[in-house]
Design a protein with these regions (language model features):
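Flexible, glycine-rich phosphate/dinucleotide-binding loops
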Residues: 12, 47, 142, 179-181
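Short, structured loop/turn "capping" segments at alpha-beta junctions
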Residues: 114-118, 168-169
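Short, well-ordered alpha-helix to beta-strand connector turns
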Residues: 86-87, 130, 167
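Structural beta-sheet core signal
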Residues: 5, 91, 133-137, 172
């Protein structure tokens, strides 16, 4: 099993709920699959440039771009190769202002490339990837249900992107309401950890 592990929290491992959950997911997946390999990418620590017109130019034929654009394409190709090689993708992400951190969005923009991870056909877009994904998510409030559910653009967005690219088998692990106090924080993490155990054991 090849695992691609992505972390996006701006907080460190000691304080980030999503980092702790994604690390536990990967640890349990490795324990259940001896010999599994892991490629790790921390998009918060190793920030990617936000996409502009250069990314489109970088994917142009070799003779039509300069050295800097070639470097942009090389970086993007490396991340796409990581994704294509993965049997399982684990993404750890907090909710920032109702959605993904901008650093994770930048990664998505670098790997969602027509002709590489999806293609346009006469009947619409078709994903070129496969495999399974686990989303280890955290939020200060509760967004999976209740009055703030319409504002949840974290799991819904990531699931939509992955499905668009062909990864339709997506499991979500949530630690919600972690800002509501120590008791809720502990309960949210316990619930998320129990779900991780159940998912990996299934």
């Amino acid at each position: 099993m090849n695992i691609l592990h992505i972390d996006a929290s701006a907080s460190d491992a000691a304080t980030s709920h999503s980092r702790r959950l994604s690390a536990e997911l990967v640890q349990k997946l490795k324990a259940a699959n001896p010999g599994a390999s892991v490629v790790y990418r921390d998009v918060a620590a190793d920030r990617l440039p936000h996409v502009d017109m250069t990314i489109r130019q970088a994917w142009a034929p070799e003779g039509e771009k300069d050295a800097s654009l070639t470097a942009t394409a090389t970086r993007s190709r490396a991340m796409i190769d990581e994704l294509k090689a993965a049997d399982v993708v684990v993404i750890g992400s907090p909710m920032y202002n109702f959605t993904v951190p901008s650093t994770l969005k930048a990664w998505i923009d670098h790997i969602a490339i027509a002709g590489q991870t999806f293609q346009y056909t006469a009947s619409g877009a078709k994903g070129l990837l496969n495999g399974k994904a686990y989303l280890a998510l955290s939020s200060g409030g509760v967004y999976s249900q209740g009055p703030f559910a319409p504002s949840e653009h974290l799991s819904t967005y990531l699931t939509a992107v992955l499905s668009f690219l062909g990864i339709s088998d997506v499991e979500v692990v949530r630690a919600e309401g972690v800002a509501y106090g120590p008791e809720q924080d502990k309960a949210a993490m316990t619930s998320a950890q129990e779900r991780i155990g159940a998912l990996v054991a299934a």
